[in-house]
């Protein structure tokens, strides 16, 4: 006889900042949050660690106590990755509560997050403008000489 494993409730969300993309998987668990297999305590750079903790501090640790979140991040620089991670974590907790808990708690969590910082749930659409010919950058032109 084989024992039936408990069902895993999984939600996948993503956060983006410039070219950094973070994909978060929220499952029912004990409140672990890992980024590329490393716990949040060991995130580098140290001065931006608090930015990653913002979704946890805003919503409260009790909400995260029954959810495990695994985040994979790639692309971009260290600051862009931090912002992509925090967005993915915030979106995953909202999506998890919408799908597996109840609508009322989801709305409460979403309101708390939006009151604090809208960029935790809504991606920044600004991207780098491509370089064009006739100059050194996207808008800068080579100097013109009349003689």
Curated annotation (Swiss-Prot):
GO MF, one example: RNA binding
Keyword Ribonucleoprotein: yes
GO BP terms, alphabetized: maturation of SSU-rRNA from tricistronic rRNA transcript (SSU-rRNA, 5.8S rRNA, LSU-rRNA); translation
Organism lineage string: Eukaryota, Amoebozoa, Evosea, Eumycetozoa, Dictyostelia
Family assignment from sequence similarity: Belongs to the universal ribosomal protein uS9 family.
Domain of life from the UniProt record: Eukaryota
InterPro entries: Ribosomal_Su5_D2-typ_SF (IPR020568), Ribosomal_uS9 (IPR000754), Ribosomal_uS9_CS (IPR020574), Ribsml_uS5_D2-typ_fold_subgr (IPR014721)
Keywords: Ribonucleoprotein, Ribosomal protein
Cellular component GO terms held in the UniProt record: cytosolic small ribosomal subunit; extracellular matrix
Name by which UniProt lists this protein: Small ribosomal subunit protein uS9
Organism name: Dictyostelium discoideum
Alphabetical list of Pfam families matching this protein: Ribosomal_S9
Entry keyword annotation includes NAD: no
